[in-house]
């Protein structure tokens, strides 16, 4: 029966705004929300905490299977992520965590270990899933698919403003370099490379406001 539950996938590179758009769309539709990136980041945190050697595939896969990840919504609507019962939300948002998550996500055995866990989020009345391979690998039969993109320079600017607003001092050039490096890893990896599904709606958000992107995505589902 899970196959009958409607799914909207929103894929795209790092820093493109998938999470922001997906959360708004899920709330408007009244559907569940899967942040697949948070799941990979949670495993990355567990790997770091356990000092697992990233070259030890067997240990990484065991960590992916064993790590307990829970998403808890606070009264203010903010989502907190618990890794093995410890609130790791702030750690998940660190740039170093993102880099480690991208590294382990390139390992086929790790992706296989997390595939079923992601598919279990498919529940009535529907699911909005954001990530990099939601429409191509995890939910290839999804009724609605979006591939969101933006120029690397624009994504770096957005991330720079986010971090500065939080009081985190960063160099714009370093952020841009990191985004380009992550794009290269995601696109060139042999397993589930970042690419739009053949039947995905392509949206370039470089010169768009969030509400404009949300409107296009909602139109895909409701029209």
From Swiss-Prot:
- GO MF terms held by the record: ATP binding; CMP kinase activity; dCMP kinase activity
Quote any Pfam family the record assigns: Cytidylate_kin
Mention one GO biological process in which this protein takes part, according to its record.
pyrimidine nucleotide metabolic process
Q: Which GO terms describe its cellular component?
A: cytoplasm
- Location relative to the cell: Cytoplasm
Superkingdom per UniProt: Bacteria
Q: Which InterPro entries match?
A: Cytidylate_kin, Cytidylate_kinase_dom, P-loop_NTPase
Enzyme Commission numbers on file:
2.7.4.25
Which catalysed reactions does the entry list for this protein? CMP + ATP = CDP + ADP; dCMP + ATP = dCDP + ADP
Keywords (alphabetical) are: ATP-binding, Cytoplasm, Kinase, Nucleotide-binding, Transferase
Residue positions annotated to bind ATP are 12-20
What is the main EC category here?
transferase
Report if keyword Nucleotide-binding is assigned: yes
Give the family this protein belongs to, as stated in its UniProt record: Belongs to the cytidylate kinase family. Type 1 subfamily.
Q: Which HAMAP family match?
A: Cytidyl_kinase_type1
Question: What's the protein name?
Answer: Cytidylate kinase
Q: Which species is this record about?
A: Xylella fastidiosa (strain M12)
């Amino acid at each position: 029966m899970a196959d009958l539950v409607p799914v909207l996938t929103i894929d795209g590179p790092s820093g493109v705004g998938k999470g922001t758009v997906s959360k708004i769309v899920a709330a408007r539709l009244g559907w569940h929300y899967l942040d697949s990136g948070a799941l990979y980041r949670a495993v990355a945190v567990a790997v770091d905490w356990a000092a697992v050697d990233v070259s030890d595939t067997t240990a990484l896969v065991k960590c992916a299977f064993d790590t307990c990840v829970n998403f808890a919504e606070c009264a203010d609507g903010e989502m907190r992520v618990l890794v093995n019962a410890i609130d790791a939300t702030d750690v998940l948002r660190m740039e170093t965590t993102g880099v480690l998550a991208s590294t382990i996500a390139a390992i086929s055995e790790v992706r296989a270990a997390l595939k079923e866990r992601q598919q279990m989020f498919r529940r009535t009345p529907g699911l909005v899933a954001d990530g990099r391979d939601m429409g191509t690998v995890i939910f290839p039969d999804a009724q609605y698919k979006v591939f969101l993109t933006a120029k690397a320079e624009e994504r770096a600017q957005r991330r720079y403003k986010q971090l500065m607003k939080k009081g985190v001092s960063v160099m714009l050039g370093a952020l841009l370099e990191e985004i380009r490096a992550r794009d290269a890893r995601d696109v060139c990896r042999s397993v589930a490379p970042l690419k739009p599904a053949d039947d995905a709606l392509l949206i370039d958000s470089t010169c768009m406001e969030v509400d404009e992107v949300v409107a296009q995505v909602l139109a895909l589902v409701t029209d």
